[in-house]
């Protein structure tokens, strides 16, 4: 391992070229180059240009952290520049949520188990909730976060990608190309967000953070209702929520079923809920109705949980898994230019004149109460 200091600019590459030359001498040839741009997004363009100007683009791969653009226009400008330096096959736009083993379980459990897959549609499901609350504050990320906010940092990236994992049609195969195509086809069916169905919030002590203006309007919370215009999902709301300084930390996908029909319909039987816990090694929970103990045939709610720790041996951390995929050329968990463009089209209404006002919420609460209305009468499964 070598360290190349001194910065990296078009005008001055620092010591990077010397370090690469040393590696070439040791290896007896040019090493494979992987440029991992885990840098502020404002530095993407100039760093990409520097890679080109110093002759480091040909035959290499480039990994870009989120956010890859901050709007449709800035995404298009950045992508045009990137494609002037790299071919699309060289570019990997990383989203570590897709690298989580538990996230990848969404499509595998669905397609491999008829028990779940046959019920995965509007015929059986009333609502899908994707919930990623955090108890943490913004810590030492004041400058980045105040320029970005929760919606841009999390909604158009992680939550949209998880929604696509849930909603995609069965791919032609489990190859990288077919998985990526299936996920991005459903992103193109995301209806542009309706600002009237979006709630933005800011935790009360946010403006007391060093580096944050007293009048900051940055959102630290977002909840949104997303509609997907495909035959499978038409009429089923996907309700997405994430935020800082909330009452609990979790990463969950909850598939809420329609009420059962038949002789128990009027007895108060609870809805079935299938929950994918994406945290850590992951788990699957099923809420179901069972008989309440006693002489009468009364319903009671029970939950069964399948922890996946017993099959987690050998699991790699998300970034390790994704960087391995980059090195081996597996693009199944990365977003193409077209897929990200579709995500920004769906997100665009939140960046216009109708963007909702930011509502203040108490630290360690569940966020603005107005977000409860997005779930209709079902309420948040995580509360």
PLM feature spans:
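Secretory/organelle targeting and membrane-embedding segments
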Residues: 2-64, 68-383
């Amino acid at each position: 391992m070598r360290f190349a200091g001194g910065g990296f600019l078009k005008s001055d590459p620092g010591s990077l070229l010397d370090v690469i030359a040393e590696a070439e001498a040791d290896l007896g040839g040019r090493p494979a180059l992987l440029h991992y741009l885990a840098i502020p997004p404002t530095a993407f363009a100039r760093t990409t240009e520097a890679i080109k100007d110093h002759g480091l683009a040909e035959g290499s791969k480039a990994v870009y952290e989120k956010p890859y653009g901050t709007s449709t226009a800035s995404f298009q400008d950045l992508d045009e520049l990137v494609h002037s330096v790299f071919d699309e096959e060289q570019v990997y736009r990383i989203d570590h949520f897709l690298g989580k083993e538990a996230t990848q379980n969404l499509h595998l459990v669905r397609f491999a188990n008829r028990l779940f897959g046959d019920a995965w549609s509007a015929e059986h499901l009333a609502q899908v909730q994707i919930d990623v609350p955090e108890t943490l504050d913004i810590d030492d990320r004041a400058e980045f976060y105040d320029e970005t906010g929760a919606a841009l940092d999390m909604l158009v990236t992680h939550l949209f990608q998880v929604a696509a994992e849930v909603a995609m049609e069965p791919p032609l195969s489990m190859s990288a190309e077919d998985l990526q195509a299936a996920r991005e086809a459903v992103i193109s069916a995301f209806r542009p967000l309706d600002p009237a169905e979006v709630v933005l919030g800011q935790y009360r002590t946010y403006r007391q953070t060093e580096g944050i203006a007293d009048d900051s309007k940055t959102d630290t919370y977002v909840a949104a209702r997303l509609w997907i215009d495909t035959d499978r999902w038409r009429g089923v709301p996907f309700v997405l929520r994430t935020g800082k300084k909330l009452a609990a930390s979790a990463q969950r996908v909850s598939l809420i079923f329609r009420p059962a029909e038949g002789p128990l319909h009027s007895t108060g039987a609870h809805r079935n809920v299938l929950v994918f816990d994406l945290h850590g090694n992951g788990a699957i929970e099923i809420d179901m109705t069972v008989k309440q103990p006693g002489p009468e045939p009364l319903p009671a709610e029970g939950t069964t949980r399948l922890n996946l720790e017993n099959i987690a041996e050998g699991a790699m951390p998300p970034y390790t898994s994704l960087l391995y995929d980059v090195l081996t050329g597996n693009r199944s968990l990365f977003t193409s230019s077209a897929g990200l463009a579709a995500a920004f089209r769906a997100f665009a209404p939140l960046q216009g004149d109708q963007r909702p006002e930011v509502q203040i919420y108490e630290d360690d609460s569940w966020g603005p109460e107005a977000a409860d209305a997005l779930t209709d009468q079902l309420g948040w499964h995580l509360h």
